Amino acid sequence: VHDDSLWNKPSVRQALGEALAFLTGDRWALSFVRRQHDVVEVGPRKLDLSIPDKIIMPYSDGLDSRAVAALVAAKENGGLVRVRLGTKGADTKGTPRKQRRFTAVPFDVKLGKRQRVESSARSRGFKFAMITGIAAQLAKVDRIVVTESGQGALGPIIASSGQIYPDYRVHPAFTQRIEKLFAAMGKSVPTYEYPRIWYTKGETLAAAHALEAAPTWHDTRSCWQDSRRVSFGGRRRQCGICAACMLRRMSMHTAGIVEASDEYIWENLGARDIHGGTVKG
C-alpha cells in the first residue's frame, strides 16, 4: 500500500477486519507492507457538467440498477454518478459523451497457480462498497445509493440456504461497517442509502416503468446460466426457470411489463411438460 502507517493503524485494521468478518463469516488476520514503487499518478481531468455531482451509485446494468438509477435521476434532477467495476457498458446513448455521469473502474486481480477464484461471490459486495466509497471521496459526495429492493437486501439473511453463513453483501448492517472503516481512516464518511428497501422488485420496476423517460428492459440479463447452456439460433437467451429468471419474470409481471417469449429458452411457464414449455428445435 502507499501509506502503510495508515492501514496498519489499530483502528483501521479493526474496522476493516470487522467488515470482512461480518461479510464472510471468517476470521481475518490483516497486515500491510509499503509498496516498493510508487504508482504513476494520473493528472486530474475535469468533466463538462453543468450540475455538480450529488450521488454515487454502484451500477451493474441489471434490472435493479436501471430502475433505481432512473428513479433517483428523476427525483434529484441530475447529479447521479453510476460506478461500475469493469469496462463494459455506457451511459444513456442520447447524452453527449462529455456529460455522461458513468465511471467504469478497471479491476483486475492476478492469482497464483495454486490459488482459486473466490467462489462465494461475497468479495463482489466488498468491492462495490469500497469502490463507491472511494468514488464518493473523489467526487466530494456524501450520498451512495444502494439499488437493491427488499428481496435483494434483506431476503438473503431471512431465507439463507442450507448451513451457509448468511449473505450480508448489500445489507445495511454491512454498509454501516464500511462507513465506520472510512471514519477510522479519517476520511469523509459517506452514507449508504436504501431508497427501495421497503419495496419489492416488482414495485420498483413498476415505478420506473411509469416514468416519462422509462428505461429499456429487454437488453438486461438476470439469468445465472452461461451462453453454452442458453444459446439458441445464434443468440444468447435466458433460461427462464432458474431462481433469478423466476424472480425476474414474476417482477416483470407485477410491474405490467410484457417481455417477448423468445427472450427465454423456457418460453411458456404454463406448459404441462418440457416439450410444450421450451423453444422448439
Task: Walk through the language-model features, giving the residues of each.
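A short N-terminal interaction module
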Residues: 1-18, 23, 31-33
